[in-house]
């Protein structure tokens, strides 16, 4: 190792570095395949080998973060979608979720440390920060993603940026980012839902309906249960009782045991 440091141009050292990087990339690609086929343990094992071969492999760290983020999502689903847990049961599952979110944050921070020009990882970090309610980090990470002109999915980062501003109560900045995201991608379901929330928070019910109605027009394309809850509330506010009741029914049927379904059933019962 000392010889390699002293003689940077030595052929043997250069060959070894290249071979390790190549081997790391092979391991990374294997991990991608395993992850896509839901073989998570095998994917993590290959990623650890990829990092051992090349500790500078930012992609490997990013994928480790995405795997942890997916696991956190699964814990959240246990708490609020497959059932609506309460008390100690919810606390237990939420603790597991938070642990996985912190793990994801740690890995993805390492990825962007190794490769500052990595917009996909910056956007992933923004998504994790939103779930951890770290609004300032979510803003900074999304902005870093948007700085890269080569990023091919800026609407996702813009939607995360707008959502972070929403939670920071900066409604004008939230509107600006989400409106731009939806304007550039009218079929962007999450963007429409978040934009509608901004309009509602500003008291602009008609604009909120304009944003959310295309989302609920096709539940197979936009299966966002919270979107149907929001649409039901908006139509109820406009006096469209039958429409609101139907939207609450659809909402409750989408995931009947979820916390959102409980809300939808409760609001449906309140309609006169």
Which residues does each PLM region occupy?
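Alpha-helical segment of the N-proximal tetratricopeptide repeat
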Residues: 22-53, 90-97
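Residue-level recognition of tetratricopeptide repeat
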Residues: 23, 57, 118, 152-154, ...
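Structural marker of alpha-solenoid helical repeat scaffolds
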Residues: 19, 53, 114, 148-150, ...
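Structural signature of tandem alpha-helical TPR/SEL1-like repeats
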Residues: 38-46, 74-82, 93-110, 132-144, ...
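Canonical tetratricopeptide repeat
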Residues: 29, 63, 124, 160, ...
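TPR alpha-solenoid repeat register
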Residues: 60, 121, 157, 191, ...
């Amino acid at each position: 190792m000392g010889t390699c440091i002293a003689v940077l141009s030595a052929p043997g050292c250069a060959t070894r570095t290249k071979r390790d990087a190549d081997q790391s990339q092979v391991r990374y690609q294997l991990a991608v395949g395993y992850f896509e086929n839901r073989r998570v343990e095998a994917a993590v094992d290959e990623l650890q080998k990829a990092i051992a071969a090349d500790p500078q492999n930012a992609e490997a760290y990013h994928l480790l973060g995405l795997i942890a983020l997916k696991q956190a999502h699964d814990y959240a689903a246990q708490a609020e979608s497959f059932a609506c847990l309460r008390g100690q049961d919810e606390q237990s599952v939420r603790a597991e979720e938070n642990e996985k979110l912190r793990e994801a944050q740690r890995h993805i921070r390492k990825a962007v440390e190794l490769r500052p020009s990595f917009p996909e990882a910056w956007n992933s970090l923004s998504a994790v920060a939103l779930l951890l309610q770290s609004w300032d980090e979510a803003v900074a990470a999304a902005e870093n993603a948007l700085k890269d002109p080569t990023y091919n999915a800026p609407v996702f980062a813009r939607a995360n940026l707008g959502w972070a501003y929403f939670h920071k109560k900066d409604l004008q900045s939230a509107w600006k980012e989400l409106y731009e995201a939806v304007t550039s991608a009218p079929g962007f379901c999450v963007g429409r839902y978040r934009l509608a929330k901004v309009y509602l928070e500003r008291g602009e019910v008609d604009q909120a309906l304009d944003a959310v109605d295309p989302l609920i027009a096709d539940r197979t394309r936009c299966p966002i249960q919270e979107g149907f809850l929001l649409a039901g509330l908006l139509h109820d506010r406009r006096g469209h009782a039958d429409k609101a009741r139907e939207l609450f029914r659809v909402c409750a049927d989408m995931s009947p045991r979820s916390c959102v379904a409980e809300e939808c059933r409760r609001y449906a019962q309140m309609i006169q």
